[in-house]
Structures are given as C-alpha cells and as structure tokens.
C-alpha cells in the first residue's frame, strides 16, 4: 500500500492510497467462486455455472463492493501509520475500478486542530457573593401564594395584577388584520404578555367599558407582516377578576408536601430549595464566565464535520422541546443553530485540551456529589441515587459533567476571581434586570 498526504485547505486533508491489484483481485475471485456455488441460473445446474457467466452477471457489483471495503480498511490502516486524527467520516473517490489494475483512490476528510490553550491568567471572573435573605424568602412565599391563588369576579375597575376577560379587534389603516381579533380573551395585567401599550388603557376600566389602544408592533415581532406597523385595538372589557391569595397556614404548607411543622417547616423547606438552586445558579454563572474567557483568549479553527454533527444534535433538541419528533418535523434551517454549534465545538475542544494538559482524571467523589445534588430535589433521594448507579448511560453522563467541572476548576485556578456582592434576583432572574 502506497500512501501520500496533502493539505488541501485549513483542516482538510487528502490521502491518496494505492492498493496492489492482487489484494483486490483475490477477494473478487473468492466472492465470485462463492456465488457460483449458490446462484441458480437458467440452463445450468446448481453449482455448475461457468465462471465467465458468473463474472459477467455479478462481477461489476462484486468489484464495487470489494473496492468499498478495501478503501475503508486501507484508509484506517493509513491514518494509523501516518498518525492522523480524523474528525468525521472520509469521502472516498476511486480513480478507476479496472480488473487487474492497482486500486488508486483518494480519501478527503478533516482533522482535529492542534490546540494549545493559552491566556488563562488573563481571564477575569466575578463570582456572585449572594445568600438567601429573609426578604428573598418572603418574596418566594408570596410567589407561591400567587401560584395557588383563586380568582374572584369584582365590580371595581381593573388594576395591576387583576385578570380581565376581553374582546378585541385590531386594525391597521382601518382594516382588520389576520390574528388581530379575539373574543373572551383572558389577560392577567402586568405580566407583559401583550405588545407595549395594549394594556395601558385597560387599567382603570370596569366590566362593560371600552378601551382604545394605539400601539406599534416591535421590529422583532414574530409575524413578518406586522413588524414595525402601527395598529389600533378596540378593547371591550367583559369581566374583571381580583386575586384571592391563600393564607400562609398549615393547610397551605401541605400543598408542598410539608405535613408536619406548619408554616415554619415550610419556610425551612423553601429556603433549603432556594439555597440549592442558588448554589447551582452561581456555579453556572461562574462557569459561563470562565468558558467565555477561555474562548476569548483562544481562537481556533473547527472542523466543519463536527459543527454539522452539533447542528443536527441542536436541531433534534429543539424538536423535542417543542414536543415533536425530529423525524417528522420540517427540518429547521442549519443557520439557526450554526453559531451555537461552533461555540459548543470550540468549547469541547478547548476543555479537552485543558483536561489533557492538566492530566485530569475523573473524581469519583465529585460524581457522587453531583448525583446527590440531583437526587436532593426529589422526594426519595435514595431511590434516585440507586437509579443513577444502576444506569451505565446516566453514570457516564455524570462522569462527563464531573470532568467538565474539574476542567473549569483548573481554569479558575489560573484566572483572577473576585467576589462581587449580588442580589438573589439578579442571579436567579437575570433577564428582569436586563
């Protein structure tokens, strides 16, 4: 076998491989002989079909099949001998498939980039210094009360946080537009569900009264034909309802599985959950900063094959999030996921090099701690831990997470990390402060 390697562009490589004719011919001959023993052809007894007839009928297909296998086998032998690490599957192109001649073919593929992580000491991370305060706990209990509130119809004017039932008709230049009309539409005021300006004149109206809302659809509105358009909505208020919040009581506590200790026990349980979620959010925030710093200080080229694989994975995840099956849904454009896919591939390659450079081995204690953290959110943590340990796939996922966390810790050890006083809501609900 003769092998030559050339760099075509970027990470793309082309191997040109020549396989001696006898390697191909011997295998073709062997398979044709096997076929002659099993094929039934009119005019010949079973097992007595002449080689020339078998060759004429099956020779080209057998040669194609053998050539494919020979190319695969010799390609992998070549990359081992040449110490090449391909990223993705190769594309084979045989020069010719002529009997009695050497098989010459090319294999085009991408390789992994050579990565040398640098600039870790230039990374700066602001670690949120935050705890769950009494005010945070009170706000969370209020949120839980609102989530379990009842609604009672009232004769008063609609106010912020009230719920109204309305009919509305929207027009643009005096014409009703598609999707601009609804009847018996429930709307909780103050939640920001509608476009800016829609709710403003509903506040202060009673059932039976009418409001006019002059609005402009945002430039990034989902309906292409409405982006940036000025519209007017005529809104009829049909019903106004006010929230009736449940009292913080022993009965209320039982809604959350707290059967003993009443409100005090509920507060302890809620604060424990808030603290666990806060710890996870802080860790995610710090990790995100570390990864962004890693990417900013290390520009690397990524194999298109890996990006394409990541795009497919993201596309499938998107289909699952929308409750669909990726097989049966219209294919979402690759452009939607390309930027995220590139970032994920770069991150994976760089973290892999951090792991390699620091000779990081998976920490079993960290794996145990990760499983325990997941399990603590469930009613029976012991059962969840046992479930994980009995599932090889889940355990491997946890080992991967642990390795990634260890890599991030290695980055943070060289980065400049500063504690910054932060409010609970700024970490848990960052979009509200945006």
UniProtKB/Swiss-Prot annotation:
Alphabetized InterPro entries for the sequence: PPIase_dom_sf, PPIase_FKBP_dom, Trig_fac, Trigger_fac_C, Trigger_fac_C_sf, Trigger_fac_ribosome-bd_bac, Trigger_fac_ribosome-bd_sf, Trigger_fact/SurA_dom_sf
Chemical reaction(s) catalysed = [protein]-peptidylproline (omega=180) = [protein]-peptidylproline (omega=0)
Q: Which SUPFAM superfamilies match?
A: FKBP-like, Triger factor/SurA peptide-binding domain-like, Trigger factor ribosome-binding domain
Q: What is its EC number?
A: 5.2.1.8
Main location per UniProt?
cytoplasm
Q: Which residues form the PPIase FKBP-type domain?
A: 161-246
A GO molecular-function descriptor: ribosome binding
* Keyword Transmembrane helix recorded: no
Q: Which GO terms describe its biological process?
A: 'de novo' cotranslational protein folding; cell division; chaperone-mediated protein folding; protein transport; protein unfolding
What are the subcellular locations of this protein? Cytoplasm
Q: Which domain of life is it from?
A: Bacteria
Q: Does the keyword ATP-binding apply?
A: no
Among Pfam families, the record links this protein to: FKBP_C, Trigger_C, Trigger_N
Q: Name one GO cellular component term.
A: cytoplasm
What UniProt keywords are attached to this protein's entry? Cell cycle, Cell division, Chaperone, Cytoplasm, Isomerase, Rotamase
Q: Which family does it belong to?
A: Belongs to the FKBP-type PPIase family. Tig subfamily.
Q: What does the record's free text say on domains?
A: Consists of 3 domains; the N-terminus binds the ribosome, the middle domain has PPIase activity, while the C-terminus has intrinsic chaperone activity on its own.
NCBIfam families per UniProt: tig
- UniProt function note: Involved in protein export. Acts as a chaperone by maintaining the newly synthesized protein in an open conformation. Functions as a peptidyl-prolyl cis-trans isomerase.
The name on file for this protein is Trigger factor
Q: What is the lineage of its organism?
A: Bacteria, Pseudomonadati, Pseudomonadota, Gammaproteobacteria, Alteromonadales
């Amino acid at each position: 076998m003769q092998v030559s390697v050339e760099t075509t562009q970027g990470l793309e490589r082309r191997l040109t491989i020549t396989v001696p004719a006898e390697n191909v011919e011997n295998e073709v001959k062997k398979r044709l002989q096997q076929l002659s023993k099993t094929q039934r052809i009119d005019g010949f007894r079973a097992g007595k079909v002449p080689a020339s007839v078998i060759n004429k009928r099956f020779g080209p297909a057998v040669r194609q099949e053998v050539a494919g296998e020979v190319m695969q086998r010799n390609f992998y032998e070549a990359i081992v001998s040449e110490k090449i690490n391909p990223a993705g599957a190769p594309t084979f192109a045989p020069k010719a498939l002529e009997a009695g001649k050497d098989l010459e073919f090319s294999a085009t593929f991408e390789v992994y980039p050579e990565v040398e992580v640098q600039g870790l000491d230039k990374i700066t991370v602001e670690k949120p210094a935050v705890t769950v305060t009494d005010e945070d706990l009170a706000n969370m209990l209020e949120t839980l009360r609102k989530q379990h509130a009842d609604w009672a119809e009232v004769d008063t004017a609609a106010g912020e946080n009230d719920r109204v039932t309305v009919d509305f008709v929207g027009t643009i230049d005096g014409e009703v537009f598609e999707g601009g009309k609804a009847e018996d539409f429930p709307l909780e005021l103050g939640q920001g569900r509608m476009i800016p300006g829609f709710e403003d004149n509903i506040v202060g109206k009673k059932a039976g009264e009418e409001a006019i809302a002059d609005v402009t659809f945002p430039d990034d509105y989902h309906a292409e034909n409405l982006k940036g358009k000025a519209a007017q909505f005529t809104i009829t208020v049909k019903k106004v309802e006010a929230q009736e919040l449940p009292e913080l009581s022993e009965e209320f506590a039982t809604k959350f599985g707290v059967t003993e200790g009443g409100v005090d026990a509920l507060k302890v349980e809620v604060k424990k959950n808030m603290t666990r979620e806060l710890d996870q959010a802080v860790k995610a925030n710090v990790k995100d900063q570390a990864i962004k710093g890693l990417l900013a200080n290390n520009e690397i080229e990524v194999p298109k094959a890996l990006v394409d694989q990541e795009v497919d994975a993201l596309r499938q995840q998107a289909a699952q999030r929308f409750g669909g099956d990726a097989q049966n849904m219209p294919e979402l454009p690759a452009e939607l996921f390309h930027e995220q896919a590139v970032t994920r591939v770069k991150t994976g390659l760089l973290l892999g090099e951090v792991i390699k450079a620091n000779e990081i081995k998976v920490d079993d204690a960290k794996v145990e701690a990760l499983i325990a953290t997941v399990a603590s959110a469930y009613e029976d943590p012991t059962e969840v831990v046992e479930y994980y340990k009995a599932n090889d796939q889940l355990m491997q996922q946890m080992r991967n997470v642990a390795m990634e966390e260890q890599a991030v810790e290695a980055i943070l050890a060289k980065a400049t990390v500063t504690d910054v006083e932060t409010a609970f809501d700024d970490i848990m609900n960052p979009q509200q402060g945006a």
